Protein backbone atom coordinates (compact mmCIF):
# COMPACT_ATOMS: atom_id res chain seq x y z
CA UNK A 1 0.00 0.00 0.00
CA UNK A 2 1.25 3.46 -0.85
CA UNK A 3 0.55 6.10 1.76
CA UNK A 4 1.45 9.71 0.99
CA UNK A 5 1.73 12.51 3.53
CA UNK A 6 1.06 16.02 2.22
CA UNK A 7 4.30 18.01 2.54
CA UNK A 8 3.65 21.62 3.48
CA UNK A 9 4.79 24.17 6.04
CA UNK A 10 3.04 22.69 9.10
CA UNK A 11 5.12 21.16 11.87
CA UNK A 12 5.38 17.88 13.72
CA UNK A 13 5.17 15.50 10.79
CA UNK A 14 7.97 13.27 12.08
CA UNK A 15 5.85 11.81 14.91
CA UNK A 16 3.21 10.72 12.41
CA UNK A 17 5.88 9.08 10.26
CA UNK A 18 7.27 7.18 13.26
CA UNK A 19 3.75 6.10 14.29
CA UNK A 20 3.15 4.71 10.78
CA UNK A 21 6.56 2.99 10.85
CA UNK A 22 5.50 1.23 14.05
CA UNK A 23 2.49 -0.09 12.07
CA UNK A 24 4.81 -1.35 9.33
CA UNK A 25 4.09 1.47 6.84
CA UNK A 26 6.78 3.53 5.10
CA UNK A 27 4.94 6.69 4.06
CA UNK A 28 6.12 9.10 1.35
CA UNK A 29 6.30 12.75 2.41
CA UNK A 30 5.59 14.70 -0.77
CA UNK A 31 4.12 17.79 -2.42
CA UNK A 32 4.32 16.19 -5.85
CA UNK A 33 0.89 16.23 -7.52
CA UNK A 34 1.25 12.86 -9.27
CA UNK A 35 2.50 11.12 -6.13
CA UNK A 36 -0.40 12.47 -4.10
CA UNK A 37 -2.96 11.53 -6.76
CA UNK A 38 -1.59 8.01 -7.22
CA UNK A 39 -1.32 7.15 -3.50
CA UNK A 40 -3.77 4.64 -1.99
CA UNK A 41 -4.23 6.80 1.08
CA UNK A 42 -3.31 10.39 1.86
CA UNK A 43 -2.51 11.81 5.28
CA UNK A 44 -2.83 15.54 5.93
CA UNK A 45 -1.38 16.12 9.41
CA UNK A 46 0.38 19.00 11.11
CA UNK A 47 0.49 21.69 13.73
CA UNK A 48 0.64 25.33 12.91
CA UNK A 49 -1.23 28.48 12.06
CA UNK A 50 -4.15 28.38 9.59
CA UNK A 51 -3.49 31.40 7.34
CA UNK A 52 0.21 30.55 6.85
CA UNK A 53 -0.71 26.97 6.02
CA UNK A 54 -3.45 28.01 3.53
CA UNK A 55 -1.18 30.56 1.84
CA UNK A 56 1.47 27.92 1.39
CA UNK A 57 -0.99 25.33 0.03
CA UNK A 58 -2.38 27.88 -2.47
CA UNK A 59 1.08 29.02 -3.56
CA UNK A 60 1.93 25.40 -4.46
CA UNK A 61 -1.48 24.64 -6.01
CA UNK A 62 -1.95 21.94 -3.38
CA UNK A 63 -5.36 23.32 -2.33
CA UNK A 64 -6.96 22.15 -5.59
CA UNK A 65 -5.03 18.87 -5.57
CA UNK A 66 -6.33 18.00 -2.08
CA UNK A 67 -9.92 18.93 -2.99
CA UNK A 68 -9.82 16.62 -6.02
CA UNK A 69 -8.48 13.54 -4.18
CA UNK A 70 -10.76 10.48 -4.45
CA UNK A 71 -8.93 8.02 -2.17
CA UNK A 72 -9.34 8.11 1.64
CA UNK A 73 -7.77 11.30 3.05
CA UNK A 74 -7.09 11.76 6.78
CA UNK A 75 -6.70 15.25 8.24
CA UNK A 76 -5.10 15.50 11.68
CA UNK A 77 -5.18 18.56 13.99
CA UNK A 78 -4.62 21.63 11.76
CA UNK A 79 -5.29 19.20 8.88
CA UNK A 80 -8.85 18.79 10.16
CA UNK A 81 -9.35 22.53 10.51
CA UNK A 82 -8.00 23.21 7.00
CA UNK A 83 -10.54 20.79 5.46
CA UNK A 84 -13.33 23.04 6.81
CA UNK A 85 -14.80 26.19 5.26
CA UNK A 86 -13.42 28.94 7.42
CA UNK A 87 -11.25 29.43 10.50
CA UNK A 88 -11.39 32.29 12.97
CA UNK A 89 -7.60 31.98 13.23
CA UNK A 90 -6.54 35.11 11.34
CA UNK A 91 -9.92 35.04 9.54
CA UNK A 92 -8.81 32.35 7.10
CA UNK A 93 -10.78 30.83 4.23
CA UNK A 94 -9.87 27.14 4.28
CA UNK A 95 -10.29 24.33 1.72
CA UNK A 96 -14.09 24.17 2.10
CA UNK A 97 -14.25 20.40 1.63
CA UNK A 98 -16.37 19.90 4.75
CA UNK A 99 -19.03 22.56 5.43
CA UNK A 100 -18.05 23.41 9.01
CA UNK A 101 -16.59 26.39 10.81
CA UNK A 102 -13.49 26.62 13.02
CA UNK A 103 -13.78 28.86 16.07
CA UNK A 104 -11.54 29.95 18.93
CA UNK A 105 -12.35 28.51 22.36
CA UNK A 106 -14.09 31.16 24.47
CA UNK A 107 -11.83 32.13 27.42
CA UNK A 108 -13.92 30.28 30.02
CA UNK A 109 -11.14 27.81 30.83
CA UNK A 110 -7.46 27.46 30.00
CA UNK A 111 -6.59 27.78 26.31
CA UNK A 112 -4.95 25.90 24.60
CA UNK A 113 -6.62 22.70 25.67
CA UNK A 114 -3.60 20.52 26.40
CA UNK A 115 -3.98 16.92 27.48
CA UNK A 116 -6.16 13.82 27.43
CA UNK A 117 -9.90 14.07 26.91
CA UNK A 118 -12.64 11.60 25.96
CA UNK A 119 -14.28 10.95 22.60
CA UNK A 120 -17.98 10.03 22.51
CA UNK A 121 -20.80 9.47 19.97
CA UNK A 122 -18.37 7.56 17.74
CA UNK A 123 -19.90 6.98 14.32
CA UNK A 124 -17.44 5.88 11.68
CA UNK A 125 -15.35 2.86 10.59
CA UNK A 126 -12.45 5.08 11.67
CA UNK A 127 -13.41 4.19 15.25
CA UNK A 128 -13.82 0.43 14.78
CA UNK A 129 -12.89 -1.27 18.04
CA UNK A 130 -12.65 2.03 19.94
CA UNK A 131 -14.79 2.22 23.08
CA UNK A 132 -16.96 5.25 23.86
CA UNK A 133 -15.21 7.53 26.39
CA UNK A 134 -11.74 6.47 25.23
CA UNK A 135 -9.00 8.99 25.95
CA UNK A 136 -7.02 10.73 23.23
CA UNK A 137 -4.47 13.54 23.31
CA UNK A 138 -5.39 17.11 22.33
CA UNK A 139 -3.35 20.30 21.90
CA UNK A 140 -5.37 23.13 20.36
CA UNK A 141 -6.86 26.60 20.78
CA UNK A 142 -9.40 26.40 17.91
CA UNK A 143 -12.20 23.84 17.53
CA UNK A 144 -14.66 22.73 14.83
CA UNK A 145 -18.27 23.64 15.61
CA UNK A 146 -20.80 20.83 15.86
CA UNK A 147 -22.13 20.01 12.38
CA UNK A 148 -23.80 17.40 10.18
CA UNK A 149 -20.49 15.64 9.33
CA UNK A 150 -19.45 15.09 12.93
CA UNK A 151 -18.42 11.50 13.73
CA UNK A 152 -17.20 12.06 17.32
CA UNK A 153 -17.71 14.59 20.09
CA UNK A 154 -15.44 15.98 22.78
CA UNK A 155 -16.42 18.38 25.53
CA UNK A 156 -14.04 21.14 26.56
CA UNK A 157 -15.67 24.43 27.51
CA UNK A 158 -18.40 23.28 25.09
CA UNK A 159 -19.21 20.15 23.07
CA UNK A 160 -17.55 20.24 19.64
CA UNK A 161 -16.75 18.06 16.63
CA UNK A 162 -13.46 16.32 17.41
CA UNK A 163 -13.79 14.16 14.27
CA UNK A 164 -15.41 14.60 10.85
CA UNK A 165 -16.19 12.51 7.80
CA UNK A 166 -17.54 13.56 4.42
CA UNK A 167 -17.27 11.14 1.49
CA UNK A 168 -13.61 10.05 1.32
CA UNK A 169 -12.41 12.77 3.72
CA UNK A 170 -11.82 11.84 7.38
CA UNK A 171 -10.43 14.14 10.04
CA UNK A 172 -9.68 14.31 13.76
CA UNK A 173 -8.68 17.21 15.99
CA UNK A 174 -6.65 15.08 18.40
CA UNK A 175 -3.29 13.46 17.74
CA UNK A 176 -3.71 9.71 17.08
CA UNK A 177 0.08 9.42 16.73
CA UNK A 178 0.40 10.56 20.37
CA UNK A 179 -2.67 8.85 21.79
CA UNK A 180 -1.08 5.58 22.93
CA UNK A 181 -2.86 2.34 21.96
CA UNK A 182 -6.18 4.07 21.17
CA UNK A 183 -4.51 6.36 18.66
CA UNK A 184 -2.58 3.51 17.14
CA UNK A 185 -5.85 1.62 16.55
CA UNK A 186 -7.39 4.68 14.85
CA UNK A 187 -4.40 5.02 12.51
CA UNK A 188 -4.63 1.29 11.79
CA UNK A 189 -8.36 1.66 11.05
CA UNK A 190 -7.60 4.43 8.54
CA UNK A 191 -4.92 2.31 6.86
CA UNK A 192 -7.41 -0.57 6.60
CA UNK A 193 -10.32 1.51 5.20
CA UNK B 1 -13.63 15.93 30.57
CA UNK B 2 -9.99 16.97 30.35
CA UNK B 3 -7.88 14.95 32.80
CA UNK B 4 -5.13 16.08 35.13
CA UNK B 5 -1.76 14.81 33.91
CA UNK B 6 1.01 12.81 35.62
CA UNK B 7 4.39 13.57 34.05
CA UNK B 8 7.59 11.72 34.91
CA UNK B 9 10.65 13.87 34.25
CA UNK B 10 13.85 12.33 33.01
CA UNK B 11 17.00 14.38 33.51
CA UNK B 12 19.47 13.20 30.91
CA UNK B 13 23.22 13.69 30.96
CA UNK B 14 25.43 12.18 28.27
CA UNK B 15 22.58 9.90 27.19
CA UNK B 16 21.72 8.58 30.67
CA UNK B 17 18.98 9.45 33.14
CA UNK B 18 20.11 11.15 36.30
CA UNK B 19 18.29 12.80 39.17
CA UNK B 20 19.73 15.32 41.53
CA UNK B 21 18.70 16.30 45.01
CA UNK B 22 18.28 20.07 44.92
CA UNK B 23 19.80 19.86 41.44
CA UNK B 24 23.13 18.61 42.83
CA UNK B 25 24.72 15.19 43.44
CA UNK B 26 23.55 13.50 40.24
CA UNK B 27 22.77 9.80 40.44
CA UNK B 28 22.51 7.46 37.46
CA UNK B 29 19.00 6.05 36.85
CA UNK B 30 19.26 4.28 33.50
CA UNK B 31 18.48 4.60 29.79
CA UNK B 32 16.03 7.46 29.14
CA UNK B 33 14.23 5.87 26.20
CA UNK B 34 13.72 2.54 27.97
CA UNK B 35 12.57 4.30 31.10
CA UNK B 36 10.25 6.56 29.09
CA UNK B 37 8.70 3.58 27.30
CA UNK B 38 8.15 1.85 30.64
CA UNK B 39 6.39 4.93 32.06
CA UNK B 40 4.29 5.19 28.92
CA UNK B 41 3.13 1.57 29.32
CA UNK B 42 2.35 2.25 32.97
CA UNK B 43 0.00 5.09 32.07
CA UNK B 44 2.14 8.23 32.29
CA UNK B 45 0.26 10.98 30.44
CA UNK B 46 3.31 12.75 29.08
CA UNK B 47 7.07 12.73 29.50
CA UNK B 48 9.60 15.49 29.96
CA UNK B 49 13.25 14.97 28.99
CA UNK B 50 15.67 17.58 30.26
CA UNK B 51 19.09 17.28 28.68
CA UNK B 52 21.66 18.66 31.08
CA UNK B 53 24.63 17.71 28.91
CA UNK B 54 26.91 20.72 28.63
CA UNK B 55 28.96 20.15 25.51
CA UNK B 56 29.64 22.05 22.32
CA UNK B 57 27.70 19.42 20.37
CA UNK B 58 24.65 20.19 22.51
CA UNK B 59 22.05 20.44 19.74
CA UNK B 60 23.27 17.21 18.15
CA UNK B 61 22.81 15.23 21.37
CA UNK B 62 19.38 16.81 21.94
CA UNK B 63 18.17 15.92 18.47
CA UNK B 64 19.50 12.36 18.72
CA UNK B 65 17.62 11.89 21.98
CA UNK B 66 14.41 13.35 20.50
CA UNK B 67 14.59 10.98 17.51
CA UNK B 68 15.05 7.90 19.69
CA UNK B 69 12.19 8.90 21.97
CA UNK B 70 9.81 9.73 19.10
CA UNK B 71 10.57 6.44 17.36
CA UNK B 72 9.71 4.33 20.39
CA UNK B 73 7.12 6.19 22.44
CA UNK B 74 3.50 6.95 21.47
CA UNK B 75 2.61 9.57 24.07
CA UNK B 76 3.55 13.27 23.97
CA UNK B 77 6.88 14.49 25.24
CA UNK B 78 8.67 17.74 25.90
CA UNK B 79 12.38 18.29 25.42
CA UNK B 80 14.37 20.90 27.32
CA UNK B 81 17.89 21.83 28.22
CA UNK B 82 19.87 24.64 26.69
CA UNK B 83 17.31 25.48 24.00
CA UNK B 84 18.06 29.04 22.98
CA UNK B 85 17.12 29.74 19.37
CA UNK B 86 14.56 29.28 16.62
CA UNK B 87 16.99 26.81 15.03
CA UNK B 88 17.18 24.68 18.21
CA UNK B 89 13.39 24.54 18.45
CA UNK B 90 12.96 23.79 14.77
CA UNK B 91 15.50 20.93 14.98
CA UNK B 92 13.75 19.38 18.01
CA UNK B 93 10.22 19.68 16.59
CA UNK B 94 11.32 18.31 13.22
CA UNK B 95 12.90 15.33 14.97
CA UNK B 96 9.56 14.48 16.60
CA UNK B 97 9.32 16.44 19.87
CA UNK B 98 5.83 17.69 20.71
CA UNK B 99 6.94 20.60 22.84
CA UNK B 100 10.13 22.35 23.83
CA UNK B 101 10.89 23.77 27.22
CA UNK B 102 12.77 27.07 27.40
CA UNK B 103 14.26 28.42 30.61
CA UNK B 104 17.50 30.45 30.88
CA UNK B 105 17.31 31.67 27.27
CA UNK B 106 13.93 33.29 27.97
CA UNK B 107 15.42 35.09 30.97
CA UNK B 108 18.33 36.32 28.87
CA UNK B 109 16.08 37.37 26.00
CA UNK B 110 12.33 37.41 26.80
CA UNK B 111 11.47 38.36 23.19
CA UNK B 112 12.62 34.86 22.19
CA UNK B 113 9.25 33.58 23.45
CA UNK B 114 7.38 35.99 21.15
CA UNK B 115 9.48 34.78 18.22
CA UNK B 116 9.06 31.09 19.04
CA UNK B 117 5.31 31.24 19.52
CA UNK B 118 4.87 33.21 16.32
CA UNK B 119 7.01 30.76 14.38
CA UNK B 120 5.75 27.47 15.85
CA UNK B 121 2.48 28.26 17.66
CA UNK B 122 2.17 28.67 21.43
CA UNK B 123 0.94 25.08 21.93
CA UNK B 124 4.50 23.74 21.69
CA UNK B 125 6.30 26.38 23.76
CA UNK B 126 6.69 25.50 27.44
CA UNK B 127 8.43 28.06 29.62
CA UNK B 128 10.17 26.48 32.61
CA UNK B 129 10.41 28.67 35.68
CA UNK B 130 12.70 27.74 38.58
CA UNK B 131 11.64 29.73 41.60
CA UNK B 132 13.07 30.12 45.10
CA UNK B 133 11.97 32.15 48.07
CA UNK B 134 14.65 34.73 48.85
CA UNK B 135 13.93 36.94 51.85
CA UNK B 136 10.17 36.53 51.47
CA UNK B 137 10.18 37.15 47.71
CA UNK B 138 9.62 34.47 45.08
CA UNK B 139 12.46 35.03 42.62
CA UNK B 140 13.14 33.35 39.28
CA UNK B 141 16.47 31.50 39.10
CA UNK B 142 18.37 30.69 35.93
CA UNK B 143 21.00 28.12 34.86
CA UNK B 144 19.41 25.06 36.41
CA UNK B 145 18.34 27.00 39.46
CA UNK B 146 21.87 28.11 40.35
CA UNK B 147 21.71 31.82 39.51
CA UNK B 148 19.21 34.13 41.18
CA UNK B 149 17.66 36.91 39.08
CA UNK B 150 15.71 39.95 40.24
CA UNK B 151 12.57 38.73 38.42
CA UNK B 152 9.45 38.27 40.53
CA UNK B 153 8.07 34.79 39.78
CA UNK B 154 4.42 35.83 39.49
CA UNK B 155 5.12 38.81 37.25
CA UNK B 156 7.43 36.65 35.14
CA UNK B 157 4.76 33.95 34.74
CA UNK B 158 2.28 36.55 33.48
CA UNK B 159 4.84 38.08 31.12
CA UNK B 160 5.70 34.68 29.65
CA UNK B 161 2.02 33.99 28.97
CA UNK B 162 1.63 37.38 27.30
CA UNK B 163 4.67 36.75 25.13
CA UNK B 164 3.25 33.45 23.91
CA UNK B 165 4.08 30.57 26.26
CA UNK B 166 1.52 27.78 25.84
CA UNK B 167 2.26 26.19 29.20
CA UNK B 168 4.34 26.92 32.31
CA UNK B 169 6.51 24.37 34.11
CA UNK B 170 6.88 25.76 37.61
CA UNK B 171 9.63 24.20 39.73
CA UNK B 172 9.93 25.21 43.36
CA UNK B 173 13.63 25.09 44.25
CA UNK B 174 12.61 25.28 47.91
CA UNK B 175 10.67 22.02 47.57
CA UNK B 176 12.69 20.18 44.93
CA UNK B 177 14.33 17.06 46.32
CA UNK B 178 12.71 17.47 49.77
CA UNK B 179 9.77 15.05 49.26
CA UNK B 180 7.79 17.37 51.54
CA UNK B 181 5.05 18.24 49.05
CA UNK B 182 4.61 20.69 46.17
CA UNK B 183 4.58 24.49 46.55
CA UNK B 184 0.77 24.52 46.52
CA UNK B 185 0.16 28.12 47.51
CA UNK B 186 2.40 29.64 44.85
CA UNK B 187 1.20 27.15 42.22
CA UNK B 188 -2.45 27.97 42.94
CA UNK B 189 -1.81 31.69 42.82
CA UNK B 190 -0.10 31.49 39.43
CA UNK B 191 -2.60 28.95 38.05
CA UNK B 192 -5.53 31.26 38.81
CA UNK B 193 -3.76 34.37 37.48
CA UNK B 194 -2.78 33.02 34.07
CA UNK B 195 -5.00 31.37 31.46
CA UNK B 196 -2.56 28.67 30.29
CA UNK B 197 -1.92 25.25 31.89
CA UNK B 198 0.52 24.94 34.81
CA UNK B 199 2.75 21.91 35.38
CA UNK B 200 3.79 21.82 39.03
CA UNK B 201 7.19 20.40 39.88
CA UNK B 202 9.37 19.90 42.94
CA UNK B 203 8.60 18.22 46.25
CA UNK B 204 6.58 15.10 45.38
CA UNK B 205 7.06 12.49 48.10
CA UNK B 206 3.71 10.79 48.70
CA UNK B 207 0.52 10.12 46.74
CA UNK B 208 -1.25 12.62 48.97
CA UNK B 209 1.09 15.35 47.71
CA UNK B 210 -0.38 14.81 44.24
CA UNK B 211 -3.94 15.12 45.55
CA UNK B 212 -2.90 18.38 47.20
CA UNK B 213 -1.22 19.87 44.13
CA UNK B 214 -4.32 19.21 41.98
CA UNK B 215 -6.82 20.45 44.58
CA UNK B 216 -5.07 23.07 46.75
CA UNK B 217 -2.43 23.86 44.11
CA UNK B 218 -4.90 23.99 41.18
CA UNK B 219 -2.22 22.51 38.92
CA UNK B 220 -3.15 21.10 35.51
CA UNK B 221 -0.31 18.58 35.59
CA UNK B 222 2.19 17.32 38.16
CA UNK B 223 5.77 16.41 37.38
CA UNK B 224 8.09 14.23 39.43
CA UNK B 225 11.31 12.31 38.90
CA UNK B 226 13.07 10.32 41.62
CA UNK B 227 9.95 8.91 43.29
CA UNK B 228 9.14 7.25 39.95
CA UNK B 229 12.73 6.33 39.01
CA UNK B 230 13.42 4.69 42.34
CA UNK B 231 10.00 2.98 42.39
CA UNK B 232 8.82 4.70 45.54
CA UNK B 233 5.47 5.40 43.87
CA UNK B 234 4.16 3.39 40.90
CA UNK B 235 2.14 5.31 38.30
CA UNK B 236 -0.80 2.85 38.05
CA UNK B 237 -1.32 2.94 41.83
CA UNK B 238 -0.93 6.71 41.91
CA UNK B 239 -3.54 7.20 39.19
CA UNK B 240 -6.03 4.83 40.78
CA UNK B 241 -5.46 6.51 44.18
CA UNK B 242 -6.12 9.95 42.63
CA UNK B 243 -9.23 8.68 40.78
CA UNK B 244 -10.48 7.45 44.16
CA UNK B 245 -10.01 10.97 45.50
CA UNK B 246 -12.28 12.31 42.75
CA UNK B 247 -9.47 13.68 40.57
CA UNK B 248 -10.10 13.05 36.90
CA UNK B 249 -7.43 10.71 35.49
CA UNK B 250 -6.96 8.92 32.18
CA UNK B 251 -7.59 5.21 32.67
UniProtKB/Swiss-Prot annotation, chain B:
Its EC number is 4.3.2.10. Keywords: Amino-acid biosynthesis, Cytoplasm, Histidine biosynthesis, Lyase. Its main location: cytoplasm. Pathway: Amino-acid biosynthesis; L-histidine biosynthesis; L-histidine from 5-phospho-alpha-D-ribose 1-diphosphate: step 5/9. One of its GO terms (cellular component) is cytoplasm. It catalyses: 5-[(5-phospho-1-deoxy-D-ribulos-1-ylimino)methylamino]-1-(5-phospho-beta-D-ribosyl)imidazole-4-carboxamide + L-glutamine = D-erythro-1-(imidazol-4-yl)glycerol 3-phosphate + 5-amino-1-(5-phospho-beta-D-ribosyl)imidazole-4-carboxamide + L-glutamate + H(+). It is found in: Cytoplasm. SUPFAM superfamilies: Ribulose-phoshate binding barrel. GO terms for biological process: L-histidine biosynthetic process. The active site is at 11, 130. It is an enzyme of class 4 (lyase). Pfam families: His_biosynth. PANTHER family: IMIDAZOLE GLYCEROL PHOSPHATE SYNTHASE HISHF (PTHR21235:SF2), IMIDAZOLE GLYCEROL PHOSPHATE SYNTHASE SUBUNIT HISF/H IGP SYNTHASE SUBUNIT HISF/H (PTHR21235). IGPS catalyzes the conversion of PRFAR and glutamine to IGP, AICAR and glutamate. The HisF subunit catalyzes the cyclization activity that produces IGP and AICAR from PRFAR using the ammonia provided by the HisH subunit. Heterodimer of HisH and HisF. Belongs to the HisA/HisF family. This is Imidazole glycerol phosphate synthase subunit HisF. The gene is hisF.
Amino acid sequence: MKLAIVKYNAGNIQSVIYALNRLGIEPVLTDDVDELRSADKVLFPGQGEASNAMNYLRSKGLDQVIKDLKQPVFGICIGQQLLCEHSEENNTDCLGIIPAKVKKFPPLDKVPQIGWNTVTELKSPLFKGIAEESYVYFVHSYYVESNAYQIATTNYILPYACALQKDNFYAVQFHPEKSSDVGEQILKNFIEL
Amino acid sequence: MLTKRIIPCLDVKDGKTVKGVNFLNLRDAGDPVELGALYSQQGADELVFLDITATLEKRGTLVELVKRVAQHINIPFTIGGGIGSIEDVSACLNAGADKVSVNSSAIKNPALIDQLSKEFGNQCIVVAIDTRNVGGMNLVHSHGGTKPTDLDTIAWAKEMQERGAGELLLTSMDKDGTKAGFANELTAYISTHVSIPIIASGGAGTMEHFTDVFTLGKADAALAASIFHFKEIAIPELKSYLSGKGIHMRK
